[in-house]
Structure formats: C-alpha cells, structure tokens
Amino acid sequence: MAWSRLMLAACLLVIPSEVAADCLSLCSLCAVRTQDGPHPINPLICSLECQDLVPPSEEWETCRGFWSFLTLTASGLHGKDDLENEVALEEGYTALTKLLEPLLKELEKGQLLTSVSEEKLRGLSSRFGNGRESELLGTDLMNDEAAQAGTLHFNEEDLRKQAKRYGGFLRKYPKRSSEMTGDEDRGQDGDQVGHEDLYKRYGGFLRRIRPKLKWDNQKRYGGFLRRQFKVVTRSQENPNTYSEDLDV
C-alpha cells in the first residue's frame, strides 16, 4: 500500500493538476458506487489508466461507462442532443451488463438447479404413485402389529419381574381392591356391602384395628379415663358424699 501511494503521488506531481484532479474525482466516484458490487473498481489503477500512465484495461472502461450513465440526467438538463443522450445510455447499459454478468450467471445456475430438483421430485412421486401406496400401507400394518406384540411382551416381562421381586406375594395376597369387589359380590346380609368408601378413605385401617368401641351411656371423657387410667369422673361419684361434707 505504501509503494502504491508513493507511485500515485509521483504521477500527480508529473502530470498537470487539473487532469489528475478530474481523473481522481471520476475514479473515486466509480469506486464508491461499485464498492458493494462483485467487481469493485480500484481507484489507483483507474486514475493511472485515465492519465494514460498505464495501458487501459477494464477498470477505466467500466468507470467511464458508469460516469456516462450518471451524467445522463445532467446532460439532459443542459439541453444536449438526443443522439448524445442515447449514446450515453448505451454506454451506461453496457457497463452495467459487464458488471452484472457474473450475478446473472449465478442466478441462472440457481434456477437450473431448482428446475432439476423439481424434475427429480416429480419423477420420484410418479414412481411412488405406481403401485407403491399398497406397499407403504403394508409396511404400516406390519409396524402396528410389531408395536402391539412388543407392548404385550413388555407387560408379561413386567409381571414376571414383579413376581420375582415379591416372591409370589401378589399371587397369594391379591390387591385389596379385588378383595373388596369380591366381598361386595358375595355379601347378602349387608355387612360388607357399602363399606368401599370407608376402605378407600382409611386404606383398610378399620379392618386391622380392634372393633368399634361402644360409647353407650358415657359422656365426653368418662369411659376413656375409666378404662385407660382408672379415673372416676365426678358424674359417676355418689352425690351423697358431697351432702355429708356440707352437713359437717
């Protein structure tokens, strides 16, 4: 970069300043306009070609075409002839086509690829349409049957694992829900029928503990204290004892 800048400065010192300024302005404008394109213009080479210090190449030609295209509106305002305007338009269009050629080629390649892929997909769909639907349905049915067989086998394996884990405990002592259903079906006297809610609520707790305590003719804590701690409540004492104490 430093060597190129020194060369540019030397060239500017040798040639007249007006021509150098014009070439630099034109090339800088072209470089700014084409910096986002696929082939940006190098302002140094363009200015050297403009000043005839380097043999002309594509840089200066494309820049000149751009400049003619950009100065078309200004030339129309100044009142130039239509022929000159047409020439400027043609030059600008040629420069644009030169710059846009690689982009157009890439777009055409992409369109060709998409068309080829669409044709391949159509061919595949036509092949599948000619007798492949029945095969697909058959494979689906086979997969469903295999899945059902796998679930049955899995359930059998689970039962075997449970039997091994509990040592046949489930076989000897079935679940309480099955016992309850059997009791309700067998019960004719009304003893076991209707207790399912209680068993669900307490989890069989009522069956395991001692029978229901009879609290007949007992007040709030009288029977409990008498049974557990052998405490006589005041309500069970003889009222005559209080009358004797008062008489004394």
Swiss-Prot record:
GO biological process: chemical synaptic transmission; neuropeptide signaling pathway; response to immobilization stress; response to nicotine; sensory perception
Domain of life where this protein originates: Eukaryota
Keyword annotations: Cleavage on pair of basic residues, Disulfide bond, Endorphin, Neuropeptide, Neurotransmitter, Opioid peptide, Secreted, Signal
InterPro entries on file: Opioid_neupept, Proenkphlin_B
Chief location bin: secreted
Signal peptide limits: 1-21
GO MF entries: opioid peptide activity
PTM remark: The N-terminal domain contains 6 conserved cysteines thought to be involved in disulfide bonding and/or processing.
Subcellular location per the Swiss-Prot or TrEMBL entry: Secreted
Maturation propeptide residues: 22-163, 177-199
Entry's family note: Belongs to the opioid neuropeptide precursor family.
Role, per record: Leu-enkephalins compete with and mimic the effects of opiate drugs. They play a role in a number of physiologic functions, including pain perception and responses to stress. Dynorphin peptides differentially regulate the kappa opioid receptor. Dynorphin A(1-13) has a typical opioid activity, it is 700 times more potent than Leu-enkephalin.
Designated name of the protein: Proenkephalin-B
